[in-house]
Amino acid sequence: MENDAGESVDLYCPRKCSASNRIIHAKDHASVQLNIVDVDPETGRMTVGSKTYAICGEIRRMGESDDCIVRLAKKDGLITKAF
């Protein structure tokens, strides 16, 4: 599709599940997206860094979303490996 300036634009950009790498379809209303921000330990305010995780409805239906989020957060260094 093109806009008024003649540039090609997409109406829908599909997301991928962070845990299973599946494409999250537009009709997957059970999927969630979590934005976890970095917090300054002294002031308690949000800094510029953040991490986004998208979990598809299939993972949530199986009850594995909490394990997947912990695994992804460990991999990104948000929580300790001994958690």
From Swiss-Prot:
Chief location of this protein within or outside the cell: cytoplasm
Location(s), subcellular: Cytoplasm, Cytosol; Cytoplasm; Rough endoplasmic reticulum
Keyword terms, alphabetized: Cytoplasm, Endoplasmic reticulum, Ribonucleoprotein, Ribosomal protein
Molecular functions per Gene Ontology: structural constituent of ribosome
Alphabetized InterPro entries for the sequence: Ribosomal_eS21, Ribosomal_eS21_CS, Ribosomal_eS21_sf
Endoplasmic reticulum found in the keyword field: yes
A biological process term (GO) from this entry: translation
Cellular component aspect of the GO annotation: cytosol; ribonucleoprotein complex; ribosome; rough endoplasmic reticulum
PANTHER family per the UniProt record, alphabetical: 40S RIBOSOMAL PROTEIN S21
Subunit and interaction comment: Component of the 40S small ribosomal subunit. Interacts with sta.
Family according to the record: Belongs to the eukaryotic ribosomal protein eS21 family.
Protein name: Small ribosomal subunit protein eS21
Encoding gene (name): RpS21
